[in-house]
Regions:
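Eukaryotic cytoplasmic intrinsically disordered
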Residues: 1, 5-9
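Short strand-edge motifs at loop-to-beta-strand transitions and within beta-strands
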Residues: 60-64, 188-190
Length: 800
């Protein structure tokens, strides 16, 4: 939960003394060295020493002072450069945690800047307690929200200066950093939003017209003129003199305190109140289902009801079709009403999205929904690239951009999915799905994506799980959540800065299943005859996903090559992000001084992004969201959160891993080990050498905190011989119907096959349904064990 902590202040003095360089970056001369310092938790400025020319042993003896906060993680970045006419050479980067310093004591640190040549940099530190009064910060133990204010800057005098025409006024460290100086006298003030405890830098810069997210990202273009702004108190009124060429301009400043409005980003690791209310209602439904399933004399009391989660995997159309089949089987044996959660990755989210358009879908016969989807899945997929559709995509994305959202290639993929799943435009949103859970009538849906952290040199990539429910979107790793209808809005320091229309569900589908990196590019080329403009940009960010190495089988569909509309759409994506960029609702928040002690973080690994707090997600202006299959191609992670207290996971895998059917489960187990999450101990080596089964049951009796896991891999084991549980196949037609190929290179269900024939669609639905119904007794036995374990956790004096 969000708490208040008293933050005291310290004064940090950093003196860059000297360096010893035994080798030069320059071929013909000695190095011309200088040092930069950056402490982003104290200042938005980057400080720099003078340049010492032609010296192997440069001396600076320059001191820089910072006002630092006691309760945030303060990492000083020190960079040693060699000045060069073309581009300066970075010699070394040092990251120093100032919590290693002893307050009140001067300390000289000797840093090795080149391990092979033993080059060194000497720096003197002094950390002194400030006499400033302490201040309250809001925190959840991981993130820290500093005091927030609006800053109005009067531009009357700027408007009369011709030198600033078409320029932007830039306030480093503020939100938004860049605001174009208007060419009209009507605008009297420009408003920025600031962290009152942060030193900022005000200046004038040329516009950066090529940046899609220009209003929140820091431009690489240097300031033409600048002046530092010390931290400003609430209610501050004053002026600052800004140099403009040989002239100066006085700007009036005024801050407005906004703290009384409270945070609009929920900083908490618990589930939201609305989900808790749902759980109370769902327990009644589940209790009644368990009474019927297990033949109980009465429904178990609310405290005894086990929490059962259905977990779907990725796998494109195969996963979507497969999940329909599995849900059909679960409905037939009465288990669907006993489930509390349902999660999905990639293709399985298509099934969920389709079903949750109906408020009571799990109470209705799923055969009707399956039949309706059959009509969509058996149409020619290349119809998604007709001229009319391309024009529609262009118009819709242009509308999204005008609303204020960042537009990316993933948006087009989402619109393709809209055509594929719904066959028409849908205006539904994620928050609309609240009506499907308000009475506890359906399992609670959790959609998934991951936020990619992969731009840190020398570090492994990190995929941070992001979950989407009808009530909230958030990243549990940081304990930060926003209302579903506000996802994509602009936030700073936990406060909403700009409200935007809620994103339509197709755009979210594009994020949840962005394996398009291969498939949509291939289909685009086939449909239009043109190489799409985004092809050169497809790198590991979006291509490291489950795809088939063999070429997919596509419908034959003839279109005129390189139509004008196709060119218009492909041109639309020039200079736009390839993966989904969304405004970061954690923007401006700092990390708590001991964040690295939390099991959500792997900061102990020096090659993990978690070890670099200045580069973690709160420091980013946007989230970089992709298909969760980039991390683990099955959605167990959201229901493994201890706050959800899941007792039984029914894991439904449609991942294409015929030679490694436990791949997604192995990755899940590794994730749990890294994050200290209870999970059954599984001997995968033994299982890999045993005959394959339709269902695996994993229960760790030594660890009652670990959920029971039922695992259904993508297999055809006994369905080849039985058309229904206990009913053998008879005759050539029935035997042929059982030959559903889900493992060879000739299978019609390979990931890149986006549509199926009617027969193939029905066959996969029936196979997945059979695998569930054929194992009814094992499923019921596991549910009974989950009920027993739940009851054993309840103290005897509690009344059920």
């Amino acid at each position: 939960m969000t708490t208040k902590e008293d933050v005291s202040y310290w004064t940090l003095s950093v003196t860059i003394l000297r360096a010893q360089n035994n080798h030069s970056q320059d071929y013909w001369s000695e190095s011309d060295c200088y040092v930069t310092l950056r402490l982003p938790t104290a200042s938005a400025r980057t400080y720099q020493t003078k340049i010492v020319p032609n010296s192997q042993s440069p001396e600076w003896n320059e001191t820089f002072n910072f006002r630092v906060h006691s309760h945030v993680k303060n990492i000083l970045e020190v960079k040693l450069y060699d000045d060069d006419l073309v581009s300066d050479d970075l010699i070394s980067t040092l990251l120093f945690d100032i919590s290693n310093l002893t307050p009140g004591k001067k300390e000289t640190k000797v840093f090795t800047t080149h391990p092979q040549t033993k080059d060194e940099l000497l720096v003197e530190f002094e950390l002194l307690e400030s006499e400033e009064p302490s201040h309250e910060y809001l925190t959840n133990g991981i993130l820290v929200a500093a005091p927030f204010s609006a800053l109005d800057i009067s531009i009357d005098k700027l408007l009369s200066n011709e030198k600033i025409k078409d320029m932007v006024l830039k306030l480093r460290g503020a939100y938004q950093e860049d605001i174009k100086i208007p060419n009209t006298q009507k605008a009297r003030n420009l408003r920025f939003y600031i962290n009152r405890d942060l030193e900022t830098e005000l200046g004038v810069a040329p516009p950066d017209n090529d940046n899609e997210a220009n209003d929140v990202t820091a431009s690489a273009v240097p300031l033409l003129s600048a002046v530092p702004l010390q931290p400003l108190r609430a209610g501050h009124e004053g002026k600052v003199t800004l140099p403009i060429g040989q002239d100066t301009v006085d700007l009036e400043l005024q801050t407005h305190d906004c703290m009384e409005e409270g945070l609009e980003v929920r900083l908490d690791f618990d589930i939201p109140p609305q989900e808790k209310e749902y759980l109370e209602k769902r327990k009644v439904v589940v209790g009644q289902a368990l009474q019927k399933l297990l033949g109980l004399s009465s429904p178990p009391g609310p405290k005894k009801v086990p929490v059962i989660a259905l977990v779907g995997s990725g796998g494109g159309t195969r996963a979507m079709t497969g999940l329909f089949g599995s849900l059909k089987g679960l409905q037939q044996i009465g288990v669907l009403d006993a489930a509390t959660y349902i999660t999905g990755v990639s293709g399985s989210t298509w099934t969920m999205t389709s079903l949750y358009q109906q408020a009571n879908w799990s109470q209705q016969d799923l055969n009707s929904a399956i039949s309706a989807m059959e009509g969509e899945m058996t149409k020619r997929f290349l119809s998604s690239f007709s001229i009319d559709k391309l024009q529609y995509y262009k118009d819709e994305m242009d509308k999204k951009r005008k609303e204020g959202h960042i537009v990316s290639l993933v948006d087009m993929w989402g619109l393709v999915l809209e055509h594929m799943i719904f066959g028409k435009k849908t205006t539904s949103t994620l928050s609309d799905q609240q009506r499907a859970v308000t009475e506890g009538q359906n399992p609670f849906p959790i959609y998934t994506a991951v936020n990619m952290k992969d731009g840190i040199t020398g570090c492994e990539a990190e995929a941070e799980w992001c979950e989407f429910t009808p009530y909230e979107v958030g990243i549990p790793k940081y304990g930060a959540f926003v209302r579903a209808e506000e996802f994509g809005n602009q936030f700073f320091l936990g406060h909403r800065i700009k409200k935007l229309p809620e994103i339509r569900i197709p755009y979210l589908m594009g994020i949840w299943s962005s394996f398009f990196s291969v498939s949509m590019t291939q289909l685009w080329q086939r449909a239009t005859g043109a190489q799409p403009s985004w092809t050169p940009w497809l790198g590991p960010d979006v291509s490291n996903i489950e795809v088939d190495s063999e070429p997919s089988t596509l419908d034959t569909y003839l279109l005129n090559p390189v139509t004008g509309v196709a060119k218009m759409v492909t041109d639309f994506f020039k200079n736009r992000p390839v993966i989904a960029h969304m405004y970061n609702f954690m923007c401006g928040l700092f990390l708590h001084w001991n964040y690295n002690k939390h099991s959500n973080f792997n900061a102990w690994k020096d090659t993990h992004p978690d070890a670099f707090p200045n580069r973690l997600t709160p420091a980013d202006p946007t989230l970089r969201l992709v298909d969760a299959g980039h991390a683990i191609n099955i959605g167990c992670v959201p229901v493994l959160r201890p706050e959800r207290d899941v007792d039984l996971i029914i894991s439904l895998s449609y991942s294409w891993d015929p030679d490694n059917i436990f791949k997604v489960l192995k990755r899940t187990a590794t994730y749990c080990k890294d994050h200290e999450i209870p999970f059954p101990s599984i001997d995968f080596v033994r299982l890999d050498n045993e005959p394959q089964q339709e269902l695996y049951v994993f229960e760790d009796k030594e660890n009652p905190k670990a959920p029971i896991v039922l695992y259904f891999p993508l297999l055809n084991v006994t369905y080849k011989e039985f058309k229904a549980p206990g009913v053998p196949r008879v005759g050539e037609a029935e035997i042929k119907a059982g030959e559903v190929d889900v493992r060879t290179s000739n299978s019609p269900y390979k990931t890149n096959n986006m549509t199926y024939s009617k027969e193939d669609y029905q066959a996969l639905v029936e196979l997945m349904s059979y695998n569930v119904t054929n194992n009814k007794e094992s499923i019921l036995e596991a549910i009974h064990r989950a009920l027993e374990r739940k009851e054993s956790k309840i103290p005897q004096y509690h009344d059920a």
